[in-house]
Amino acid sequence: MLKWAIILAIVALIAGALGFSGLAGAAAGVAKILFFLFLVGFVLVLLLGGTVFKAATGPK
């Protein structure tokens, strides 16, 4: 999925440079959605990873 976000961002840049506003807008919109999905997933992994790591090491 990250590969598609990068591809769509590149397509949006190329289409924007060539003036295809409809295609650039659509590709940029999808890239933004995928970016925020990955951002939320990253934060969740950080939070859950911290709690799982603390539980695995036990109390001090």
UniProtKB/Swiss-Prot annotation:
Keywords: Cell membrane, Membrane, Transmembrane, Transmembrane helix. This is UPF0391 membrane protein CCNA_00709. Belongs to the UPF0391 family. GO terms for cellular component: plasma membrane. It is found in: Cell membrane. The keyword Transmembrane applies. It is a multi-pass membrane protein. The chain crosses the membrane at residues 4-24, 33-53.
